[in-house]
Amino acid sequence: MARLQEYYRSTVVQQLMEQFGYKSVMEVPRIRKITLNMGVGEAVADKKIMDNAVGDMQKIAGQKPVVTKARKSIATFKVRDGYPVGCMVTLRRVRMYEFLDRLVNIAIPRIRDFRGISGRSFDGRGNYNMGIKEQIIFPEIEYDKIDALRGMNITITTTAKTDAEAKALLAAFKFPFKN
């Protein structure tokens, strides 16, 4: 069992039950999945760029990403229907908790000029989105071996009904919110 998963079961559940007055343990919000998405628009010109992006994503997530393809042709962007334009990974269970642990304790503190993550990026249904500008904040990526700095979106999907519940859940996991 992952360290954060054990921490959730032993500490976070009790803390949230007291804070929100839940009657059952099953009412307590939990993290359902974490989705990493990397858009690689430059891959239209060179297929090697997509291979490098997939390799970086695989190192970060510990799981093989799915290559996302364009749904329709757009002449302005020189994109045709079916061209690879990005990659994504959905993490669940043990890998999800291990990634969350690395994200909160190692990767986020390595962001340049870091002053805390925004508490406004909730979607109204208890899910949190954040963007990362550089993949080199993760320790798995070696700075010398990358061809370009690429950003990614990280979506944390929870079972929380409201943003306040989701923020309390992520704060219990020691997310460094600004305020």
UniProtKB/Swiss-Prot annotation:
One Gene Ontology term from the biological process aspect of the record: translation
InterPro entries noted in UniProt: Ribosomal_uL5 (IPR002132), Ribosomal_uL5_bac-type (IPR020930), Ribosomal_uL5_C (IPR031309), Ribosomal_uL5_CS (IPR020929), Ribosomal_uL5_dom_sf (IPR022803), Ribosomal_uL5_N (IPR031310)
Keyword Cell wall biogenesis/degradation attached: no
Superkingdom as given in the UniProt entry: Bacteria
Keyword Chloroplast: no
Family according to the record: Belongs to the universal ribosomal protein uL5 family.
Protein name in the entry: Large ribosomal subunit protein uL5
Name of the gene encoding the protein in the UniProt record: rplE
